[in-house]
Amino acid sequence: MENPYEITAIVAREILDSRGNPTVEVDVHTPIAMGRAAVPSGASTGTHEAVELRDGGKRYHGKGVRRAVENVNKIIAPELIGMDVRWQREIDKLLIELDGTENKSNLGANAILAVSLAVAKAAANSLELPLYQYLGGVNAYVLPVPLSNVINGGVHAGNELDFQEFMIMPIGASSFREAIRWVSETYHVLKRVIMGKYGKNAVNVGDEGGFAPPMKEVTEPLDALIKAIEEAGYKPGDEIALAIDAASSEFFKDGKYIVGGKEYTREELLDLYKELVSTYPIVSIEDPFHEEDWEGFVMITNELGKKIQIVGDDLFVTNPRRLKKGIELGAANALLLKVNQIGTLTEAMDAAYTAFRAGYSVIVSHRSGETEDTTIADLAVALNAGQIKTGAPARSDRNAKYNQLIRIEEELEGIAVYAGKNFRKVFF
């Protein structure tokens, strides 16, 4: 008798991401269903991330992924065909073994992850379950607070802002649908605020849909956000809070942090963060120090960790080993979860549970180069993470995730809980 959950075919192809760069998409087939997944790509990447395989050469300026696609079609597919699509952990283990390197540089993390995610989707579709329920079970019911990146700086934009992201968090909303409305309304008011001060050319958007105005001082975007929140009719802090991704590895040079043209020591930069947190309703700071500045992370966690969320992105790169080191040291109190930093769904979920067990919060995150794939929306609900970071409410690659969360909330009507002000500890 035919096993309806047996993998019968795996097909990979090269498609384009939101920046017009190639990425990998994979279809996994069973006799009764198909799962499709496409992988994202980051601009500010941590040194310890799993490695994307790119072709080099002239084609696509060296960014083609035909080698990764070939690795799926010729190496991975023959090994997985015949396996039960529901064996996610076994399949991911096999993918890691087939690659044989610690950073997945042989087959490519982009090839491996596309297969891993497509397997999960094929299993969910074969079982006629929504992906969030397949991954999280009947207890997956918490809708996340969006950390919406509405002003872009750093490597995501062409302005002089050193900090990479300035985000709004609708913590006072009563549902995800209300939260995303608050974000959208504030975003449109922000456009007006920026145009009024910097002119109509200042509302071009960055990779993640946020505006990239000609700002330089770190306080300029924060002041603009407060003004936009108030003019949209909301209360800064109580209803809509602020969050920052400093991405400080990008402005760390020769042992110093360069912000706004000024040099800062670790201690001076910590003082700047403390001043910002005391002045503005900031509830989360991501990558406040360089990815190897463990001491800086410990310092800021000791100083501000009881009051706000200190997030490790480049610090942890969704890597369980680096996360465990951070937990032992007391560095940061939150994990930014990016599935493509580690390369398989199993490893990403393991990292999330490691964080939860240590009392760390988890933010499921997109990358700056995205696709229309909505897996991370389902993953945020599956984990009851309470937070998702997936850009401004603009550009279809970002809104695809928000729209999926709206659908999930609708499916869970009567059961769904919006994390709101409990975004850091949804069950406490």
Curated annotation (Swiss-Prot):
Gene3D superfamilies: Enolase-like C-terminal domain, Enolase-like, N-terminal domain
Similarity comment: family membership: Belongs to the enolase family.
Residues annotated for (2R)-2-phosphoglycerate binding in this entry: 164, 338, 367-368, 389
Function: Catalyzes the reversible conversion of 2-phosphoglycerate (2-PG) into phosphoenolpyruvate (PEP). It is essential for the degradation of carbohydrates via glycolysis.
Protein name (database record): Enolase
GO biological-process terms attached to the record: glycolytic process
Cofactor binding comment, as recorded: Binds a second Mg(2+) ion via substrate during catalysis.
Keywords for the protein's UniProt record, in alphabetical order: Cytoplasm, Glycolysis, Lyase, Magnesium, Metal-binding, Secreted
Pfam families in alphabetical order: Enolase_C, Enolase_N
Catalytic residues (positions): 208 (proton donor), 338 (proton acceptor)
SUPFAM superfamilies: Enolase C-terminal domain-like, Enolase N-terminal domain-like
Cofactor needs: Mg(2+)
Record-listed E.C. numbers: 4.2.1.11
Main location (coarse class): cytoplasm
Main enzyme class: lyase
GO molecular function, one term: magnesium ion binding
Catalytic activity annotation: (2R)-2-phosphoglycerate = phosphoenolpyruvate + H2O
Ranges annotated as spanning the membrane: none
Gene from which the chain derives: eno
GO cellular component: cell surface; extracellular region; phosphopyruvate hydratase complex
Residues bound to Mg(2+): 245, 286, 313
Compartment list: Cytoplasm; Secreted; Cell surface
Domain of life: Archaea
Coiled coil: none
Signal peptide stretch: none
Keyword Calcium among record annotations: no
